[in-house]
């Protein structure tokens, strides 16, 4: 970075938005890295930005993949639009060639029927009706006659000729050059002897040329019925019998790619002035649109009906469209087209210009009238109009849905198209997610090349060769460290994600059947600050709800127990060592708590541990029921507590929040019943259910474990799924065993344990940890195999981790000096208490001192513990346990300190005090007084002695002094002598004269000032 160039900075909220993460999550990570930031709006430098990107690289990669998929989808949509536009152009070009063919065939058919009876009259441009009779091939006529379709005749609409408008039949503009008296639609139907009704015409789809006024020979009406929205055209014809149908030609997306040559046009007289659009009126039938020829000879007469349906379905017509187009192309010879126009006038009398049209030149006809018509209609060739890009852009979505959608089912087809697009999008996103997941290898730390090869789908030989290339010589079963696994996975295009040995060997379970699910009791944890009445509330509930007077029934100290309220409704309470154990369980993923009762003393305040308990409950997604305890005291102030809780984010229902609150007195039992009712209400809202099937392998969570002298390892298990039975083989973490006995909280033996029921389990081979998941296996062999796999991984992990910690410790001590450590051995009654103590002690440390846990275990203090403490210079902390006789004698002999506690907070306070005593004290300078030298005396064998006057303070004989000359320090040391009148004194007060000499310094002068001070040590705090 050059001088004056500012370092680029990033806002935390912008980084979170880029990674699609919560700003609080990014802020918490930045704070963990030791960076001081105030809020999510704070700015960080590039180094911190790099740390965030490296930490959340997986999220960053997922965001990049999502953006890549989105870009590909947009590119694919653009390509689809381009293909649709090209398809539309091809369709328009092909319709230019096919439409004149159909019009020529229709005109020829009309002419052949009406020629014998026609008497042509004079007009500006008279065209014989039989001029195009030979334009229709015989093969096409035979095909149409062979497949007729009968439909009900529809009333024909009469429209005045001057108001005739071009009809638009398609949603897209067709570039065909229209001709006179021709429409680019099919099939055609002639209606005979039908009443004529004058109604408004609807807007058609195809652009059709205007009708040129002809000399009417006879009155007839031609009704043109197209698929979807059709057009009715009334022309002056004299038809003796129904004319054969023209084969239907429907518009389809599957158009021929071949280029159609120009077609010989029909001659016409062009108009000079364009006419304004005529008024459109709706018809009776929306599927029919009619146009009437000029009424010149006394009106129109319907003489017959022509059935043009072929009897085939819409799909078959679409399918055969290409075949018909190819047949027509081979049948007719295509020549150049010329513009055709007509001088039709609108109702306002303005001449309207017709659009150019194309016509097909037929083979040599049998009649000379057709030849004369061809010669008369030759004209000048006109350039085709360009494609209207605006129309294509406006109708591109409809083009994608289906170009030939005119059957009235457009909404359904659009819906199906939308659903199909959604499915394709979901499939693409799922494929991208699967591809991303396939590139992630979930592996345990210190895995072997053989295990890593199986996970990545390659051979172990490839991994060993890659290790050789990296300078590592390994065998197939040798354990790799974390850095090597990450590097090897990256070389093969994978990303390593490390999981614990329990997650790597997790037992897959089937989904619970609906018929096996039943309502289960809620699991409630009581949390709160120390001395706020948590233990008192538990004691009252147990005394009032547990059955008393049972023979030999002594309430056991367990981590969970069950009470019955309202006759048959049960609640399970967790008696954990506090919120520390709750945090440990949540960290292991054991969400065993359904509801949290937050106890707050009404005569106190919301303490920091109360806030911490609230945060733990919210992070676990557990509802909170607030219990305001000690309400019977005179100094109780519930409103103040409610206000403080609202500031902490817990707004009770009375104040418009969602958290229930109950005022209680744990000692007098006030409000306890109402509190239980609110807990049950919260449980009903959550609809807690459990699997009670005996066929399902049971599972549960270890609440706590202890070592009983007569029973061995005893663990308290909270069943979560299935039914736990005596004799079931199981695995819990790295421990295994077989259920030898089940006991409830009163020590009574039971045979079955159901969901949400706490039970004491006997039969563990090793002591499990609190929070481990107990899973019942199908056989003892399966349980042993699974436990051995976990134990191997754990031993390797512990061995590598301990070695690495020692090396790190050596490097740290070389870099920072020797750190003072307080070695501690913990023995407790339960595993849950040990974990709570260990977590609390590890938090008490700073850069100079810390707690080093030498050993921790469950059970009484033994001789082995004493010997270990003596060898490592450690202290022993006994939590609710005592040493045996031999251990006590050995501790007295070794002069070893053993501390006994029953409250976890007392342990933390004493250890914190001990660590503070190990800290180096802070040194402060305390000023005592100042002396001014006013005269110098020369004493033999002593040197210069100053005659002084004490300006302020008190100067003791043993004080440290500094000599100042003109405000500059000249000397710092101690006094050699302090006298008054030849007598040595211990101190001289302010306002007195004295004589002094400095130790090892003789250069003093009149006017110098001597300051007296001393160094004071101050005790440091953690």
UniProtKB/Swiss-Prot annotation:
<feature type="region of interest" description="G1">
    <location>
        <begin position="528"/>
        <end position="535"/>
    </location>
</feature>
<dbReference type="InterPro" id="IPR023115">
    <property type="entry name" value="TIF_IF2_dom3"/>
</dbReference>
<dbReference type="GO" id="GO:0005737">
    <property type="term" value="C:cytoplasm"/>
</dbReference>
<protein>
    <recommendedName>
        <fullName>Translation initiation factor IF-2</fullName>
    </recommendedName>
</protein>
<dbReference type="InterPro" id="IPR000178">
    <property type="entry name" value="TF_IF2_bacterial-like"/>
</dbReference>
<feature type="region of interest" description="Disordered">
    <location>
        <begin position="342"/>
        <end position="436"/>
    </location>
</feature>
<dbReference type="InterPro" id="IPR027417">
    <property type="entry name" value="P-loop_NTPase"/>
</dbReference>
<feature type="region of interest" description="Disordered">
    <location>
        <begin position="82"/>
        <end position="129"/>
    </location>
</feature>
<keyword id="KW-0396">Initiation factor</keyword>
<feature type="region of interest" description="G3">
    <location>
        <begin position="575"/>
        <end position="578"/>
    </location>
</feature>
<feature type="compositionally biased region" description="Basic and acidic residues">
    <location>
        <begin position="82"/>
        <end position="94"/>
    </location>
</feature>
<feature type="region of interest" description="G5">
    <location>
        <begin position="665"/>
        <end position="667"/>
    </location>
</feature>
<comment type="function">
    <text>One of the essential components for the initiation of protein synthesis. Protects formylmethionyl-tRNA from spontaneous hydrolysis and promotes its binding to the 30S ribosomal subunits. Also involved in the hydrolysis of GTP during the formation of the 70S ribosomal complex.</text>
</comment>
<dbReference type="Pfam" id="PF22042">
    <property type="entry name" value="EF-G_D2"/>
</dbReference>
<dbReference type="InterPro" id="IPR000795">
    <property type="entry name" value="T_Tr_GTP-bd_dom"/>
</dbReference>
<keyword id="KW-0963">Cytoplasm</keyword>
<feature type="domain" description="tr-type G">
    <location>
        <begin position="519"/>
        <end position="689"/>
    </location>
</feature>
<feature type="binding site">
    <location>
        <begin position="629"/>
        <end position="632"/>
    </location>
    <ligand>
        <name>GTP</name>
    </ligand>
</feature>
<feature type="compositionally biased region" description="Basic and acidic residues">
    <location>
        <begin position="421"/>
        <end position="436"/>
    </location>
</feature>
<keyword id="KW-0547">Nucleotide-binding</keyword>
<dbReference type="InterPro" id="IPR005225">
    <property type="entry name" value="Small_GTP-bd"/>
</dbReference>
<feature type="region of interest" description="G4">
    <location>
        <begin position="629"/>
        <end position="632"/>
    </location>
</feature>
<dbReference type="GO" id="GO:0003743">
    <property type="term" value="F:translation initiation factor activity"/>
</dbReference>
<dbReference type="InterPro" id="IPR036925">
    <property type="entry name" value="TIF_IF2_dom3_sf"/>
</dbReference>
<dbReference type="Pfam" id="PF11987">
    <property type="entry name" value="IF-2"/>
</dbReference>
<dbReference type="GO" id="GO:0003924">
    <property type="term" value="F:GTPase activity"/>
</dbReference>
<dbReference type="InterPro" id="IPR015760">
    <property type="entry name" value="TIF_IF2"/>
</dbReference>
<comment type="similarity">
    <text>Belongs to the TRAFAC class translation factor GTPase superfamily. Classic translation factor GTPase family. IF-2 subfamily.</text>
</comment>
<keyword id="KW-0648">Protein biosynthesis</keyword>
<dbReference type="InterPro" id="IPR009000">
    <property type="entry name" value="Transl_B-barrel_sf"/>
</dbReference>
<feature type="compositionally biased region" description="Low complexity">
    <location>
        <begin position="104"/>
        <end position="115"/>
    </location>
</feature>
<dbReference type="Pfam" id="PF00009">
    <property type="entry name" value="GTP_EFTU"/>
</dbReference>
<feature type="binding site">
    <location>
        <begin position="528"/>
        <end position="535"/>
    </location>
    <ligand>
        <name>GTP</name>
    </ligand>
</feature>
<keyword id="KW-0342">GTP-binding</keyword>
<feature type="compositionally biased region" description="Basic residues">
    <location>
        <begin position="375"/>
        <end position="384"/>
    </location>
</feature>
<dbReference type="GO" id="GO:0005525">
    <property type="term" value="F:GTP binding"/>
</dbReference>
<dbReference type="Pfam" id="PF04760">
    <property type="entry name" value="IF2_N"/>
</dbReference>
<dbReference type="InterPro" id="IPR053905">
    <property type="entry name" value="EF-G-like_DII"/>
</dbReference>
<dbReference type="InterPro" id="IPR006847">
    <property type="entry name" value="IF2_N"/>
</dbReference>
<feature type="region of interest" description="G2">
    <location>
        <begin position="553"/>
        <end position="557"/>
    </location>
</feature>
<feature type="binding site">
    <location>
        <begin position="575"/>
        <end position="579"/>
    </location>
    <ligand>
        <name>GTP</name>
    </ligand>
</feature>
<dbReference type="InterPro" id="IPR044145">
    <property type="entry name" value="IF2_II"/>
</dbReference>
């Amino acid at each position: 970075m050059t001088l004056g160039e500012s370092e680029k900075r990033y806002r935390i909220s912008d980084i979170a938005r880029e990674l699609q993460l919560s700003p609080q999550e990014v802020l918490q990570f930045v704070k963990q890295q030791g960076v001081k930031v105030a809020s999510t709006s704070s700015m960080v430098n590039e180094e911190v930005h790099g740390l965030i990107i490296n930490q959340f690289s997986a999220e960053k990669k997922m965001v990049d993949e999502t953006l890549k998929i989105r870009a590909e989808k947009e590119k694919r949509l653009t390509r689809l639009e381009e293909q649709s536009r090209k398809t539309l152009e091809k369709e328009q070009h092909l319709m230019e060639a096919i439409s004149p063919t159909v019009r020529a065939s229709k005109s020829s058919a009309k002419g052949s029927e009406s020629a014998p009876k026609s008497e042509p009259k004079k007009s500006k441009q008279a065209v014989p009706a039989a001029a195009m009779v030979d334009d229709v091939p015989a093969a096409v006529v035979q095909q149409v006659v062979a497949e007729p379709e009968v439909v009900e005749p529809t009333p024909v609409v009469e429209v005045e000729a001057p108001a005739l408008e071009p009809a638009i039949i398609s949603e897209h503009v067709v570039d065909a050059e229209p001709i006179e008296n021709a429409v680019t639609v099919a099939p055609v139907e002639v209606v005979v002897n039908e009443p004529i009704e004058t109604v408004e015409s609807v807007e058609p789809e195809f652009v059709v040329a205007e009708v040129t006024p002809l000399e009417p020979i006879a009155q007839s009406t031609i009704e043109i019925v197209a698929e979807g929205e059709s057009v009715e055209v009334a022309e002056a014809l004299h038809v003796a019998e129904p004319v054969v149908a023209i084969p239907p030609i429907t518009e389809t997306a599957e158009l021929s790619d071949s280029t159609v040559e120009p077609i010989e046009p029909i001659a016409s007289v062009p108009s000079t002035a364009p006419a304004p659009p005529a008024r459109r009126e709706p018809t009776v039938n929306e599927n029919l649109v009619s146009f009437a020829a000029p009424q010149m000879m006394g009106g129109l007469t319907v003489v017959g009906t022509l059935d043009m349906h072929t009897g085939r379905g819409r799909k078959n017509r679409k399918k055969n469209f290409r075949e018909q187009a190819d047949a027509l192309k081979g049948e007719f010879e295509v020549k150049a087209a010329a513009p055709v126009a007509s001088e039709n006038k609108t109702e306002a009398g303005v001449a309207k210009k017709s659009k150019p049209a194309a016509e097909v030149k037929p083979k040599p006809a049998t009649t000379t009238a057709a030849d004369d018509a061809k010669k008369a209609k030759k004209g000048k060739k006109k350039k085709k109009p360009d494609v209207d890009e605006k129309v294509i852009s406006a109708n591109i979505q409809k083009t994608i849905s289906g170009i030939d959608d005119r059957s009235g089912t457009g909404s359904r087809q659009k819906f199906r198209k939308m659903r199909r697009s959604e499915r394709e999008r979901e499939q693409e996103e799922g494929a991208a997610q699967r591809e991303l997941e396939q590139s992630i290898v979930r592996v345990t730390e210190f895995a072997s090349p053989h295990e890593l090869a199986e996970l990545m789908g390659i051979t172990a030989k490839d991994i060993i060769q890659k290790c050789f290339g990296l300078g590592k010589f390994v065998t197939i079963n040798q354990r790799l460290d974390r850095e090597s696994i990450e590097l090897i996975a990256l070389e093969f295009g994978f990303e390593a994600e490390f999981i614990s040995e329990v997650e790597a060997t997790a037992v897959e379970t089937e989904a619970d059947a609906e018929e096996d699910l039943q309502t289960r009791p809620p699991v409630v944890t009581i949390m709160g600050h120390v001395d706020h009445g948590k233990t008192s509330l538990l004691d009252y509930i147990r005394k009032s709800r547990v059955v008393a007077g049972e023979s030999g029934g002594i309430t056991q100290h367990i981590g969970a127990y069950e009470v019955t309220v309202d006759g048959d409704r049960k609640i399970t309470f967790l008696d954990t060592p506090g919120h520390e154990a709750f945090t440990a369980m949540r960290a292991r993923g054991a969400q065993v708590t359904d509801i949290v009762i937050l106890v707050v003393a009404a005569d106190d305040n919301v303490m920091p541990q109360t806030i911490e308990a609230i945060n733990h409950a919210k992070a676990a997604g557990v509802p909170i029921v607030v219990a305001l305890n000690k309400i019977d005291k005179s100094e109780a102030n519930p409103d103040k507590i409610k206000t403080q809780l609202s500031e902490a984010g817990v707004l009770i229902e009375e104040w418009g929040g969602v958290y229930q609150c109950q005022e209680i007195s744990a000692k007098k039992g006030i409000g306890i019943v109402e509190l239980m009712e609110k807990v049950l209400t919260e449980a009903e809202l959550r609809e807690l259910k459990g699997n009670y099937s005996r066929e399902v392998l049971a599972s549960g969570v270890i609440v706590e474990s202890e070592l009983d002298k007569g029973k061995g390892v005893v663990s308290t298990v909270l069943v979560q799924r299935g039914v736990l039975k005596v004799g079931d083989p199981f695995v819990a973490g790295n421990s295994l065993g077989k259920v030898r006995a089940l006991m409830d909280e009163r020590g009574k033996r039971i045979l079955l344990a159901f969901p949400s029921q706490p039970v004491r389990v006997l039969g563990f081979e090793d002591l499990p940890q609190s929070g481990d998941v107990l899973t019942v296996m199908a056989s003892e062999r399966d349980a042993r195999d699974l436990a051995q796999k976990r134990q191997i991984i754990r031993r390797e992990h512990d061995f590598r981790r301990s070695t690495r910690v020692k090396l790190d410790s050596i490097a740290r001590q070389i870099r920072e000096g020797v750190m003072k450590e307080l070695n501690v051995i913990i023995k407790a009654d339960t595993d849950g208490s040990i974990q709570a103590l260990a977590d609390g002690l590890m938090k008490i440390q700073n850069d100079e001192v810390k707690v080093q846990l030498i050993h921790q275990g469950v059970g009484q203090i033994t001789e082995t513990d004493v010997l270990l403490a003596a060898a490592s210079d450690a202290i022993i902390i006994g939590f609710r346990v005592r040493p045996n006789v031999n251990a006590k004698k050995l501790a007295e002999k070794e002069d070893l300190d053993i501390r006994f506690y029953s409250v976890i907070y007392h342990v933390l306070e004493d250890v914190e005090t001990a660590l503070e005593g190990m800290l180096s004290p802070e040194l402060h300078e305390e000023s005592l007084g100042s002396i001014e030298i006013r005269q110098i005396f020369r004493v033999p064998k002593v040197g210069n002695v100053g005659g002084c006057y004490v300006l302020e303070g008190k100067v003791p004989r043993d004080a440290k002094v500094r000599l100042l000359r003109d405000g500059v320090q000249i000397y710092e040391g101690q006094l050699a002598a302090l006298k008054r009148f030849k007598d040595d004194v211990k101190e001289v007060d302010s306002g007195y004269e004295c004589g002094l000499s400095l130790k090892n310094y003789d250069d003093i002068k009149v006017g110098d000032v001597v300051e007296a001070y001393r160094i004071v040590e101050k005790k440091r705090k953690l």
